């Protein structure tokens, strides 16, 4: 029997998901990121890469690699294209996350399995996990973090936020809600508390 708790971290854009995941990793949890997984397998000459090129056109490949800025420009204003792209990528992301979970569980080296999945509810993936942690922050704080980190405009922030479902709705379904309106140190203390609570959950 695999006795390793499956925990997903999710939340809106620039809420602090990655920072929370980093704290869990520092404490000994195994952490996998859905975004990093998709980056790892999305190469032009792979089967999935060819499907993406067929969908979006050859101009999304620059210097034998996918240009993520070009992809973003193509899909963020086109819901049909965005959904078609996600239909290609998300099943593979899920397959890799689940495959990795079973490998990590067999090794018995980590107290928790953490998957950072930004669009967890939007892709109907929450039920696979034993616990869901929702990281939240006020919109003005998230906007400031996003624009400072990316040098993108407020408009770009709101366009990207449109992909996420209602935060209030997600709060109703999450097992744990961590508010992240303060400092990184404050977030760390909150995550540490939940780490030890979850560690003893099985």
Curated annotation (Swiss-Prot):
Major subcellular location class: cytoplasm
tRNA-binding in keyword set: no
GO cellular component: a single term: cytoplasm
Metabolic or biological pathway, per its Swiss-Prot or TrEMBL entry: Cofactor biosynthesis; coenzyme A biosynthesis; CoA from (R)-pantothenate: step 5/5
InterPro entries: Depp_CoAkinase, P-loop_NTPase
GO terms of molecular function: ATP binding; dephospho-CoA kinase activity
Catalytic activity from the UniProt record: 3'-dephospho-CoA + ATP = ADP + CoA + H(+)
Pfam families associated with the record: CoaE
Its EC number(s): 2.7.1.24
Superkingdom classification of source: Bacteria
Keyword terms: ATP-binding, Coenzyme A biosynthesis, Cytoplasm, Kinase, Nucleotide-binding, Transferase
Boundaries of every DPCK domain copy: 6-202
Location in or out of the cell: Cytoplasm
Task performed by this protein: Catalyzes the phosphorylation of the 3'-hydroxyl group of dephosphocoenzyme A to form coenzyme A.
Family note: Belongs to the CoaE family.
NCBIfam families for the chain: dephospho-CoA kinase
Name of the featured protein: Dephospho-CoA kinase
Organism: Chlamydia caviae (strain ATCC VR-813 / DSM 19441 / 03DC25 / GPIC)
Gene that this polypeptide is encoded by: coaE
């Amino acid at each position: 029997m695999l006795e390793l708790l499956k925990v997903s971290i999710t939340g809106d854009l620039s809420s602090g998901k990655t920072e929370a995941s980093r704290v869990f990793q520092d404490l000994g949890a195994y952490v996998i990121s859905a975004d990093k997984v998709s980056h790892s397998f999305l190469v032009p000459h792979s089967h999935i890469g060819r499907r993406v090129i067929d969908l979006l056109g050859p101009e999304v490949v620059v210097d034998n690699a996918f240009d993520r800025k070009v992809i973003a420009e193509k899909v963020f204003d086109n819901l049909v294209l965005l959904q078609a792209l996600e239909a290609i990528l998300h099943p593979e992301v899920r397959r890799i996350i689940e495959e990795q979970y079973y490998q990590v569980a067999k090794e018995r080296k980590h107290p928790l399995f953490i998957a950072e999945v930004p669009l967890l509810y939007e892709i109907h993936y929450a039920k696979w996990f034993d616990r869901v942690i929702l990281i939240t922050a006020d919109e003005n704080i998230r906007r400031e973090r996003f624009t400072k980190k990316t040098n993108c405009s407020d408009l770009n922030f709101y366009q990207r936020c449109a992909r996420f479902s209602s935060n209030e709705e997600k709060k109703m379904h999450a097992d744990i809600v961590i508010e992240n309106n303060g400092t990184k140190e404050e977030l760390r203390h909150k995550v540490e508390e939940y780490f030890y609570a979850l560690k003893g959950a099985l």
